């Protein structure tokens, strides 16, 4: 069989990335942003080609991500936020809407929007995913964005 397989590579050279992050739970979200920045720079990205947009909470992240994707200025958008389950159903509603909103924005805009929104049951789980035991999900979201930019370039 002679089937061609096309994949994106992990070179951020000359690509432009917007990071949208929520200020709510920023003591963890800031670590995710640091992970995303580190990933882009380590993969030959330039700090001049990165901008960080801060919004109030995870519910607003999809709106900002969509606006950034529609602007035509960015090769990819990295969506970052931190949701930690509390005593009410509020977590479930915000987590579901943020997830759906980010996916919908990416599909509608044709620009990769990677998902770096933590949805955890405890603060300890969030901390683990922000650079301790379970890696840094901001890094993972940036890595996915880089790969998708390069895959899109081959389409």
UniProtKB/Swiss-Prot annotation:
Record pathway: Cofactor biosynthesis; riboflavin biosynthesis; riboflavin from 2-hydroxy-3-oxobutyl phosphate and 5-amino-6-(D-ribitylamino)uracil: step 1/2
Residues annotated as binding (2S)-2-hydroxy-3-oxobutyl phosphate: 87-88, 129
Pfam families referenced in this protein's UniProt entry, alphabetically: DMRL_synthase
Enzyme class name: transferase
One GO cellular component, as annotated: cytosol
EC number(s) reported in the record: 2.5.1.78
Keyword Membrane: no
Residues where 5-amino-6-(D-ribitylamino)uracil binds: 24, 58-60, 82-84, 115
GO molecular function, one term: 6,7-dimethyl-8-ribityllumazine synthase activity
Top-level division of the source organism's lineage: Bacteria
InterPro entries per record: LS, LS/RS, LS/RS_sf
UniProt keyword Transferase present: yes
Keywords in alphabetical order: Riboflavin biosynthesis, Transferase
Catalytic activities: (2S)-2-hydroxy-3-oxobutyl phosphate + 5-amino-6-(D-ribitylamino)uracil = 6,7-dimethyl-8-(1-D-ribityl)lumazine + phosphate + 2 H2O + H(+)
Active site, UniProt feature: 90 (proton donor)
GO biological process terms, semicolon-separated: riboflavin biosynthetic process
Function: Catalyzes the formation of 6,7-dimethyl-8-ribityllumazine by condensation of 5-amino-6-(D-ribitylamino)uracil with 3,4-dihydroxy-2-butanone 4-phosphate. This is the penultimate step in the biosynthesis of riboflavin.
Similarity-based family: Belongs to the DMRL synthase family.
Cross-referenced HAMAP family: Lumazine_synth
Protein name stated in the entry: 6,7-dimethyl-8-ribityllumazine synthase
């Amino acid at each position: 069989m002679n089937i061609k397989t096309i994949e994106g590579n992990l070179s951020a050279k000359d690509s432009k990335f917007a990071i949208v992050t929520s200020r709510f739970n920023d003591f963890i979200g800031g670590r995710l942003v640091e992970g995303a920045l580190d990933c882009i720079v380590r993969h030959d990205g330039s700090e001049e080609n990165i901008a960080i947009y801060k919004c109030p909470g995870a519910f607003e992240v999809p709106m900002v991500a969509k606006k950034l994707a529609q602007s035509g200025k960015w090769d990819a958008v990295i969506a970052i936020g931190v949701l930690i389950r509390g005593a009410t159903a509020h977590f479930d509603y915000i987590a579901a809407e943020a997830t759906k909103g980010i996916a919908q924005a990416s599909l509608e805009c044709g620009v990769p929007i990677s998902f770096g929104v933590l949805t955890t049951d405890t603060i300890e789980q969030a901390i683990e995913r922000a650079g301790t035991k379970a890696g840094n999900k901001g890094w993972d979201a940036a890595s996915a964005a880089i790969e998708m930019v390069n895959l899109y370039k081959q389409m």
